[in-house]
Amino acid sequence: FEGDCLPGRHFVPGSARPRSGGGDGGGMKSYRQELWFETAKRREYRNITASVEECLRASGIREGLLLCNAMHITASVFINDDESGLHADFEEWLEGLAPEKPHSRYRHNGFEDNGDAHRKRTIMGREVVVAVTGGKLELGPWEQIFYGEFDGMRKKRVLVKIIGA
């Protein structure tokens, strides 16, 4: 947009082009991997940081961004501390906001019995994006990546997509 240009610079429609690092046309890469999970319980939190780090190593990307998202509407990917008391607090908090029973509480449950799981996923989020620097995830000291399952005991997938150079 012309209004977004810096003073003294002019926007020429059609002049913007995607650029790759270094101008050699081959600097930007992308990598895609699916992680599959099947939990033993209906609701479960699983630390997937090591699996995501393995995807990053396999990608060979040193600088960029990593997207990790749950590919199912009743599961979540989020970042937090790996502490069992905190996980119990999540469970209590989410159950207070969207209790599993009675199933009649949710209009959605006329078709299925997982209306609560849809709400829990909405609260905890679909994905995380993490900066990649020097081939490492830029996570804080206690930050870990988690898969949150709210309607489990069946096979579900998480997508890891990495872009960078």
Describe each PLM feature range:
Residues F1-A165:
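Active-site histidine-anchored catalytic micro-motif
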